[in-house]
UniProtKB/Swiss-Prot annotation:
GO molecular function: ATP binding; metal ion binding; protein kinase activity; protein serine kinase activity; protein serine/threonine kinase activity
Organism in which the protein naturally occurs: Homo sapiens
Name of the protein this chain belongs to: Serine/threonine-protein kinase Nek5
Compositional bias per record (Basic and acidic residues), positions renumbered to this chain: 440-454
SUPFAM superfamilies: Protein kinase-like (PK-like) (SSF56112)
Record-listed E.C. numbers: 2.7.11.1
Length: 708
């Protein structure tokens, strides 16, 4: 650390910190990553050392450069290039919702893809590609891939790792499902970074880890803006394929025209030639093999393509199968033609050398041929003899006597296993059956027993057992219901003396009472039996059944009445609104009886509805006010009149009908003391005036005065 001046801390991780420093000798800015070994487990120590080794190998314009590494006081220091633009996530957050242009997105994506191609070509998985591990420099124009802390070196590019590592938002479906993965996992993470550049947000988000994993495994994401090109839409959909086999490789991504045209903008011709030289190996090797002829050139091109597409195991199996068939079906020519074959055998290693490591496979094939066949001649693969050789395989195949003992043993075991399975399925009788020997004799005589009848018999037996179980269930249910009825008293107790005999029940000819309804008509029957003592038992049974029927009828009637009342509750609580009465006008009603009935009648004792109660209260109030007004009127106008209680009651009940004969005006006039009603002389006026004055003094309200 004496060679650097630490300026400030720019980051902190689980086991260390990152500082911005400046070299004392050259005054260049750099990043020093400090890792504390004391608190770190062994696996993390190995990962840190691995990062140092990887960074030393990585030299690419789009990968963060490695300067130096050293250890001091149990700490590891890694000196790396400083990117003044920060990481890509900070750049995305500074946009504040404003989308990047498509040119800017494609420029960054091509540079990230070039850096990823560099490490994939060296059989390294990054396994933590995310926006925080992509750094910008030169005012954000150059993107570089960094932080190889959890990268893994693979022995082969198709080797599958099983460790679940990575940031949750960038995890691939195979990691979430704990399945093997390879470099296609980095392709999924690369698609997540591209989606963030297009939308400024994560492609897969959830409230919890379980919801996030579910969306990742189903590849459910919102589409990007329709303002982007169709090629960009198609690329994102291909990067987010759930199956790793359906995702493109990094080389096929960079071969797309709209991305391939941008590569010269960020790499020099020398770097382009170095990075893409392995793709031109087949073109460079073609002129060297022209002396071998057209057939050799075709064979070489096919093998080079085969080498790039298929895994190593399939490369071994295909040539062995083909050459084994050719060797077994070989046609042996005369001795004079063997020299040409020896010449061809000498030329073949040259072809294999052109095709890469196929010389090792051909050597293994030759060794296998020499072991199987001792003659020293070697077969020559011919282009037009493949179909003929395959046809000769069936003709000149080895006889059964020449089959190896291991094959015969396996065949015997397979037959025994087949026989055992047939016995278990019922297709073949078991040796434990009593008539097994008879079946064997029939089979030896050519009479094959009917094994197909056995499944039908088994089905019939199963069906019988099924019906038997149903009968048991029915009987059990019948017994349970019988016990329940006994407890409820509906069924009489069984008499031990009753024997199971046949009884004849007939209706009686006795007349039925008219008062009884149809449902309540008594049932009278006559019994006949085939055994003595039937009458007592029949009578007891009849009485019990009739009693139970009466109870059931009563209960049924009560239930019907309750249902009617529940459906129409107004009928149950409906008040009587009218009383029907009859008046006999012929009879003479005395006043005394009427007064006694009025005294016995008490209005509050009657059953009143709510409306009648309110009217009764109003009537009481009016009556009280009427009494007060009558008393006041008596005091003011006629205190000496001396109305009796009977007249006051008559005034109060003025609107009611009296029970006696009506006292009309004519009767009152008949009682009055009047000498004549019609005046006959001139003195009549004086007589009338005198009578008026007398009437005024006697009673001002008399009917005579009213008529006057």
């Amino acid at each position: 650390m004496d060679k650097y001046d630490v300026i400030k801390a720019i980051g902190q991780g689980a086991f260390g910190k990152a500082y911005l420093a400046k070299g004392k000798s050259d005054s260049k800015h750099c990043v020093i990553k400090e890792i504390n070994f004391e608190k770190m487990p062994i696996q993390e120590k190995e990962a840190s050392k691995k990062e140092v080794i990887l960074l030393e190998k990585m030299k690419h314009p789009n990968i963060v450069a490695f300067f130096n590494s050293f250890q001091e006081n149990g700490r590891l220091f890694i000196v790396m290039e400083y990117c003044d633009g920060g990481d890509l996530m900070k750049r995305i957050n500074r946009q504040r919702g404003v989308l990047f242009s498509e040119d800017q997105i494609l420029g960054w994506f091509v540079q990230i893809s070039l850096g990823l191609k560099h490490i994939h070509d060296r059989k390294i998985l990054h396994r933590d590609i995310k926006a925080q591990n992509i750094f910008l420099s030169k005012n954000g124009m150059v993107a570089k891939l960094g932080d190889f802390g959890i990268a893994r070196v693979l022995n082969n590019s198709m080797e599958l790792a099983r460790t679940c590592i990575g940031t949750p938002y960038y995890l691939s479906p195979e990691i979430c499902q704990n399945k093997p993965y390879n470099n296609k996992t980095d392709i999924w993470s690369l698609g997540c970074v591209l989606y963030e550049l297009c939308t400024l947000k994560h492609p897969f988000e959830g409230n919890n880890l379980q919801q996030l994993v579910l969306k990742i495994c189903q590849a459910h994401f919102a589409p990007i803006s329709p303002g982007f090109s169709r090629e960009l839409h198609s690329l994102i959909s291909q990067l987010f394929q759930v199956s790793p086999r359906d995702r493109p490789s990094i080389n096929s991504i960079l071969k797309r025209p709209f991305l391939e045209n941008l590569i010269p903008k960020y790499l020099t011709p020398e770097v382009i030639q170095e990075e893409f030289s392995h793709m031109l190996i087949c073109r460079a090797g073609a002129p060297a093999s022209r002396h071998a002829g057209k057939v050799v050139q075709k064979c070489k091109i096919q093998k080079v393509r085969f080498q790039g597409k298929c895994p190593p195991r399939s490369r071994i199996s295909v040539p062995i199968k083909r050459n084994a068939i050719l060797h077994r079906n070989e046609w042996r020519p005369p001795a004079g033609a063997q020299k040409a074959r020896s010449i061809k055998m000498i030329e073949r290693p040259k072809i294999a050398a052109v095709c890469g490591h196929y010389d090792y496979y051909y050597a293994q094939l030759d060794m296998l041929r020499r072991r199987a066949h001792k003659p020293s001649y070697h077969p020559i693969p011919q282009e037009n003899t493949g179909v003929e050789d395959y046809g000769q395989e069936t003709r000149h195949g080895p006889s059964p006597s020449q089959w190896p003992a291991e094959y015969l043993q396996r065949k015997f075991e397979a037959q025994q296993y087949k026989l055992k399975v047939e016995k278990q399925l019922g297709l073949r009788p078991s040796s434990a059956e009593p008539n097994y020997n008879q079946r064997q004799e029939l089979r030896s005589n050519g009479e094959e027993p009917r094994f197909q009848e056995l499944p039908f018999r088994k089905n019939e037996m199963k069906e019988q057992e099924y019906w038997k179980q149903l009968e048991e269930i029915r009987q059990q249910y019948h017994n349970d219901m019988k016990e329940i009825r006994k407890k409820m008293g509906r069924e009489p107790e069984e008499n031990s003396k009753i024997s199971h005999k046949t009884y004849l029940v007939k209706k009686s000819n006795l007349p039925v009472h008219q008062d009884a309804s149809e449902g309540e008509a008594p049932v009278q029957m006559e019994f006949r039996s085939c055994c003595p003592g039937w009458s007592a038992m029949a009578r007891s049974w009849l009485t019990a059944t009739s009693a139970s029927q009466d109870i059931e009828k009563d209960l049924k009637q009560m239930r019907l009445q309750n249902t009617k009342e529940s459906k129409n509750p107004e009928q149950k609580y409906k008040a009587k609104k009218g009383v029907k009465f009859e008046i006999n006008l012929d009879k003479c009603i005395s006043d005394e009886n009427i007064l006694q009935e009025e005294e016995a009648m008490d209005i509050p004792n009657e059953t009143l509805t709510f409306e009648d109660g309110m009217k009764f209260k109003e009537y009481e109030c009016v009556k009280e006010h009427g009494d007060y007004t009558d008393k006041a009127f008596e005091k003011l106008h006629c205190p000496e009149a001396g109305f009796s209680t009977q007249t006051v009651a008559a005034v109060g009940n003025r609107r009611q009908w009296d029970g006696g004969a009506p006292q009309t005006l004519l009767q009152m006039m008949a009682v009055a003391d009047i000498t004549s009603t019609c005046p006959t002389g001139p003195d009549s006026e004086s007589v009338l005036s005198v009578s008026r004055q007398e009437g005024k003094t006697k009673d001002p309200y008399s009917p005579v005065l009213i008529l006057m």
